[in-house]
UniProtKB/Swiss-Prot annotation:
This is Centrosomal protein of 44 kDa. Keywords: Coiled coil, Cytoplasm, Cytoskeleton. GO terms for biological process: centriole replication; centriole-centriole cohesion; centrosome cycle. Residues 194-224 are annotated as: Disordered. Its main location: cytoplasm. Residues 224-263, 353-379 form a coiled coil. It comes from Xenopus tropicalis. Binds to centriolar microtubules. Residues 194-204 have a biased composition (Acidic residues). GO terms for cellular component: centriole; centrosome; cytoplasm; midbody; spindle pole.
Length: 385
């Protein structure tokens, strides 16, 4: 190819694109400039969309040409050309991605198209040889029809009725003419039978092909049906998940509306808080009782002393009021043990003080018990926290 013949290269490329049935628009200005964005769509179409067999080969090799950057796409294409087609391009990957070398790029694309078309024809030819249906050999026994006397009788009766309807016509034939007619009739029957035999064979072959179906159709239908079933299952699962999501969203909205303006606390935390509040209240009560104890003792002592003083005064008054003559007239000098003697006064005072001390002791014991219980509760709460 002469250098500078860009138009000739574009004509060759157009011929290759016609063989591929390329449906997209071609950027001729980009081809002339050597812009890689004009060449890459043609390469991707030839490898992915033109032939399903070549696309299957690429998938089996684990090569993906879709959803890639230009550099990775060119790297994958060069790998396919090297491993599958044994073709080494003139330009390097970096040169192909530059805006130059338009003629050589067009030549590379033409070579790629030729390699792909050739490989496609080889694969389809092999598949046709493998999948040719075996012709059924029709024997003479199969072609023979079964004779039923009832059908013959019906046909004869129909012919007799038709002959009765027609007018009788009698002709006289000589022996030689009759023999010639019979020979012509036999030869015509043989020719018709010979013509019907190949047509019947063709009809049987076509019927077998229809019944058996082409292997390509069956091979294509089975994966397609499996894919459709998988897609249906996935759609059903997606619909179920969407319904669950809708239910969850509705429940969340109802919870948000019901819990709006409220504070949610765990049950254990709430119980701990209640226990601590009770402990604090008991501590305050105990402290207040401790502060009130000396005042209470002082008041109780003051009351008891005032009572004793009042009793002593009342006893003295009663003693002064009793006349001495009354004591002398009785004939004995009796001493009022309970009222007049100082020993009795001391006994009464001691009994009163003992009773008040007992009451205060009981109260103090109760308070100490409460203090011990609260201290144990505080220790337990500290250990648990």
């Amino acid at each position: 190819m002469a250098t500078g013949d860009v138009k000739g290269c574009i004509r060759k490329l157009e011929q290759r694109l016609r063989t591929l049935n390329y449906p997209r628009d071609v950027d001729y200005s980009g081809l002339i400039k050597g812009d890689p964005s004009a060449f890459l769509p043609i390469i991707s179409y030839t490898f992915t969309c033109y032939s399903t067999s070549i696309a299957e080969i690429l998938i089996s090799l684990g090569i993906e040409l879709a959803t890639k950057s230009d550099l990775r796409f060119i790297e994958a294409v060069y790998k396919v050309l090297r491993d599958v087609f044994n073709y080494k391009p003139i330009l390097t990957k970096q040169q192909f991605l530059q805006c130059a070398f338009s003629e050589r790029k067009i030549q590379i694309i033409c070579d790629i198209v030729d390699c792909v078309v050739k490989k496609h024809k080889e694969i389809t030819g092999q598949n046709k040889i493998k999948n040719q249906p075996v012709k059924k050999i029709v024997s003479a026994k199969d072609q023979c029809e079964v004779f039923y006397p009832e059908d013959m009788f019906v046909q004869l009766s129909v012919k007799t009725e038709m002959s009765t309807q027609k007018k009788p016509l009698v002709e006289r034939h000589t022996g030689s003419e009759f023999q010639l007619q019979t020979k012509c009739y036999k030869s015509a029957l043989l020719e018709e039978a010979e013509e019907e035999e190949p047509t019947s064979d063709c009809e049987e072959d076509s019927h077998l092909q229809r019944e058996m179906g082409s292997p390509f159709e069956t091979a294509e239908e089975t994966p397609n049906s499996e894919q459709v079933e998988l897609l249906r299952k996935q759609l059903a699962e997606c619909q179920e998940k969407l319904q669950r999501l809708d239910c969850v969203e509705e429940r969340l909205q109802s919870l948000e509306t019901s819990v709006k303006g409220k504070i949610i606390i765990d049950e254990t935390d709430w119980n701990n808080l209640l226990g601590r509040v009770l402990l604090l209240e008991t501590e305050r009560l105990l402290q207040s009782k401790k502060s009130d104890l000396p005042e209470f003792a002082r008041i109780s002592e003051h009351r008891t002393s005032s009572r004793m003083a009042n009793e002593i005064c009342s006893n003295l008054k009663t003693k002064a009021d009793i006349p001495e003559s009354h004591h002398q007239s009785s004939g004995y000098s009796s001493v009022l043990s309970a009222d007049t003697s100082p020993i009795a006064i001391d006994i009464n005072y001691s009994s009163l003080t003992e009773e008040s001390k007992e009451t205060t002791k009981q109260r103090m014991e109760r308070i100490t018990k409460m203090m011990e219980e609260t201290s144990e509760l505080l220790k337990f709460s500290n250990n648990t926290s």
